[in-house]
Swiss-Prot record:
GO terms for molecular function: fibroblast growth factor receptor binding; growth factor activity. GO terms for cellular component: extracellular region. Expressed in the developing brain. The gene is Fgf15. This is Fibroblast growth factor 15. GO terms for biological process: bile acid and bile salt transport; fibroblast growth factor receptor signaling pathway; heart development; negative regulation of bile acid biosynthetic process; negative regulation of gene expression; neural crest cell migration; positive regulation of cell population proliferation; positive regulation of D-glucose import. Belongs to the heparin-binding growth factors family. The lineage of its organism: Eukaryota, Metazoa, Chordata, Craniata, Vertebrata.
Length: 218
């Protein structure tokens, strides 16, 4: 009896550890793995994947707000999370992403002088950024073509931005990401434990309809 109970405890602990890793981590552009377009982004790997996030601006110029790409192509910042500043991120190459505003359906792009703006059509040269992380854990974005970091600033003319520090950002998950994790945990604890099975919570057969990747619309 004790041996059977220990088997159940081990199985439950393994499943809980897997779920914790899946829903608690913030994606970091540090490692690479091959993932299909349909798979959700759960850990730190990069592939051809899409994720829904807000981009929180943490300074040093504009701070305490969320980046938004307006329908007229301008880029500004809003204090609250809402449908207007929800962004889609897609990894188009190793540690390289495209960013698209869900509401305005415009891609974040950069001109030769470092100005950021929104385009309806994706341009591989102007709308592709390398996602980097500094020593303090902030995300920074550098244009692959122009070799300039995004400097999110509204007060100074663009010609005065040379040698300025990059803007710091924190990607914030959309609440649906955590709701999916809650659904998965709730379903797991409602299932009878089958200690003799390789899938004691029957998660493999049911997980597909619970976890879905957000679509990256063209």
């Amino acid at each position: 009896m004790a041996r059977k109970w220990n088997g159940r405890a081990v199985a439950r602990a393994l499943v809980l550890a897997t779920l914790w890793l899946a829903v608690s981590g913030r994606p970091l552009a540090q490692q690479s793995q091959s993932v299909s377009d349909e798979d959700p982004l759960f850990l730190y790997g990069w592939g051809k994947i899409t994720r829904l996030q807000y981009l929180y601006s943490a300074g040093p110029y504009v701070s305490n707000c969320f980046l938004r790409i307006r329908s007229d192509g301008s880029v500004d910042c809003e204090e609250d999370q809402n449908e207007r500043n929800l962004l889609e991120f897609r990894a188009v190459a190793l540690k390289t992403i495209a960013i698209k505003d869900v509401s305005s359906v415009r891609y974040l792009c950069m001109s030769a002088d470092g100005k950021i703006y929104g385009l309806i059509r994706y341009s591989e040269e102007d709308c592709t950024f390398r996602e980097e992380m500094d020593c303090l854990g902030y995300n920074q974005y550098r244009s692959m073509k122009h070799h300039l970091h995004i400097i999110f600033i509204q007060a100074k003319p663009r010609e005065q931005l040379q040698d300025q520090k990059p803007s710091n950002f924190i990607p914030v998950f959309h609440r649906s990401f955590f709701e999916t994790g809650d659904q998965l945990r709730s379903k797991m604890f409602s299932l009878p434990l089958e200690s003799d099975s390789m899938d004691p919570f029957r998660m493999v057969e049911d997980v597909d309809h619970l976890v879905k990747s957000p679509s990256f619309q063209k």
